[in-house]
Regions:
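Beta-strand-rich recognition/accessory modules
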Residues: 2-45, 55, 65, 138-144, ...
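N-terminal onset of structured domains
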Residues: 30, 35, 45-51, 157-162, ...
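Extended, loop-rich substrate-binding clefts of extracytoplasmic carbohydrate-active enzymes
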Residues: 32-34, 102-161
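Hydrophobic residues positioned within well-ordered beta-strands of beta-sheet architectures
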Residues: 40, 50, 133-135, 153-155, ...
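Asparagine-centered strand-capping/turn motif at beta-strand->loop junctions
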Residues: 169-175, 314
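Active-site/ligand-binding surface loops and adjacent short beta/alpha elements
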Residues: 178-180, 184-263
């Protein structure tokens, strides 16, 4: 139902919104941030941009052609080890949450990733107007001491010609034994105000409430709205979820494959105050809606590979 609604909106949008076509070809640029960490800036033909840091393999920014930021980034975020960056799209791997020996949400989000050039592939496509980068993380010797599992995680970040942000991920078991993991693409959407948004596509699903020891509940039939702290894992959702923002007249559509669950998080006032890397009022400007595989870990045989994909589209209502 959500899907058909959005298709209509998208068609409507192309008729009523003027898209300023800029003749610069799509581009790929590498820069260093103030800590000397490499960032990649992708730009498509239309002028949308995505900025990615090799620290965490993390998308930090996604802007439309008008320069509006679509992802939330905390004003107090730190961009260097050992902290994870509060905003954008941190990758929670190989676990979600803080169970077991591993650090909260695993270690992928605070390790240095590399650009994966094997096999070499073009970074931009002039005829199709998109730009892309392949990122790779393998465990260090230190990581293997804490979590003795050899793996390769690859994420291909693409900014499509029509401005969609696409994350294609692959995890390969490089062990001689089975590999089990959780994964979540924690996505901090930038919103006008938490009281102005609703999420559709999670109605009537079962969820685990992380504020109540992961007890299982069932969601009501209405779209989700927010008036207090939320930290939930919705189980086995359909492949399309939408975040409507009435304040900015913007809709984010999340399409996912291989990622059955959807984690939804907003820390609200009290927890925001307790988080040193989030401004006291900034919880109003963010909502995390994450494509994830949490309830049932993904298990791979030796040499086996898992694939997942997330595609974010932003639609304006006019
Ligand atoms: C551009 O993208 C199209 C569609 O994905 C592909 O068929 C073509 O080979 C690409 N061109 C280059 C130069 O990579």
């Amino acid at each position: 139902m959500v899907l058909s609604l959005l298709v209509v909106e998208k068609n409507k949008m192309t008729n009523c919104e003027e898209i300023s076509l800029d003749s610069r070809p799509p581009s790929y640029e590498e820069i260093k941030d103030k800590n000397g960490i490499t960032q990649i800036i992708l730009r498509n033909l239309r002028g949308d941009t995505v900025r990615i840091s090799l620290y965490g393999g993390q998308v930090l920014s996604w802007k439309n052609e008008q320069g509006d930021e679509l992802l939330f980034m905390s004003s107090k975020a730190t961009f260097k080890p050992p902290n994870a960056v509060r905003g954008g799209i941190p990758i929670c791997f190989p676990q979600f949450g803080s169970r077991g020996l591993l650090e909260q949400h695993g270690f992928a989000r605070n390790r240095m990733w590399v650009i994966d050039d094997q096999p070499p592939s073009p970074r931009t496509n002039k005829s199709k107007g998109y730009a892309t980068v392949n990122l790779l993380l393998k465990p260090s010797d230190e990581d293997l001491k804490v979590w003795p599992n050899k793996f390769e995680i690859r994420v291909r970040v693409t900014l499509s010609e029509d401005g969609n942000l696409v994350l294609r991920s692959r995890v390969k078991n490089a062990n001689g034994k089975p590999l089990s993991f959780n994964i979540a693409f924690r996505t901090y959407f930038a919103i006008s105000d938490i009281s102005e948004v609703r999420v559709e596509g999670l109605e009537t699903l079962d969820y685990l409430d992380c504020l109540q020891d992961r007890q299982r509940f069932t969601e009501q039939g209405d779209a989700l709205t927010f008036e207090s702290e939320v930290d939930r894992i919705y189980l086995s959702s359909s492949d399309v979820v939408a975040l409507f923002d009435h304040g900015s007249k913007r809709t984010f559509q999340i399409r996912k494959q291989g990622l059955p669950d959807v984690a939804v998080w907003n820390p609200w006032e009290k927890k925001a105050k307790a988080l040193t890397d989030l401004g006291d009022d900034e919880y109003k400007k963010m909502l995390c809606v994450d494509g994830s595989a949490i309830e049932k870990p993904i298990t791979l045989k030796p040499g086996e590979e898992w694939n997942g994909q997330l595609e974010f589209t932003v639609l304006s209502s006019c």
